[in-house]
Amino acid sequence: MTPTTIAIHGAAGRMGRRLVALGSIDPELKIVAAVDSPSSPDLGKDAGLLAGTVELHVPIAGALNVQPQAVIDFSVPHAAEQILQICLSRQVPLVLATTGCNDAQKAQIHLAAQTIPIVWSPSMSTTVNLAMKLCATAGAVLKQMASGVDVEIIERHHRMKEDSPSGTALKFGEIIAGVMGQQVHRHGREGQVGRRPQHEIGYHAVRTGDNPGEHTIVFGLLGETLEITVKATNRDCYALGALAAAKFAACQGPGLYSMSDVLGL
């Protein structure tokens, strides 16, 4: 079987290095490009050695100079916007794992997906996407409770994370609201806010240390509570999911796909 050729955008970052390390030992993949910011101090370094693995003879570059079968982006919104346009112009499938995109950037993603295959998900984790499926099921059952259900989402990430709440937390809320019908999304509480209305979802973001990601979704009823918690113990879960998504995207036609499509959920 011929390996799928991939490029990693954001290759010198924390996630990019794990993508390089894990992608380099996957017999179904071949890393042919590793791209980072043109101002990165790691330009020219071997991507494999930078990631702490074997030499790959693939230098960190400031631009995409080859034609891979798929690109994986783990960067920041403005850089993701640039690689999106490059993939669009070259007709290259894209796995978009960057979070924190604004509405205009999201609109560009939807438009580009009419021309190229894009796997776009706030989390590449298998268990996170399974938890989303469980939350949709729970919401469909619990919304019938006469006493009402209070939904709160608590997410924890490392101190370096720039967007809050996480894109994954917002996706959990979007899924639950789509099933249960909540209209208000409240971010934290402070002061005399009054009694809690049942038509809202509360979000609470915690930033500590090097936590790679944790989400707890609370369904509170009278007399009982259901909590669904998913925890990442390291970043490999996101990298492995993104690598699987690249294999998937390389075989698809134009369209906007999610990790649910990759996992068959």
Model-predicted regions and their roles:
Residues 130-146, 164:
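Rossmann-like NAD(P)H-binding beta-loop-alpha module
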Residues 93, 108-125, 142, 146, ...:
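Rossmann-fold dehydrogenase core element
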Residues 83-85, 89-90, 98-120, 129-137:
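Rossmann-fold NAD(P)-binding glycine/threonine-rich loop
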Residues 75-76, 99, 207:
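Short glycine-/small-residue-rich Rossmann-like dinucleotide-binding loops
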Residues 71-72:
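N-terminal Rossmann-like NAD(P) cofactor-binding module of classical short-chain dehydrogenase/reductase
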Residues 5-65, 147-265:
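C-terminal substrate-binding/catalytic lobe of Rossmann-fold NAD(P)-dependent oxidoreductases
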Residues 13-14, 78, 125:
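Residue-level detector of alpha-helix initiation sites
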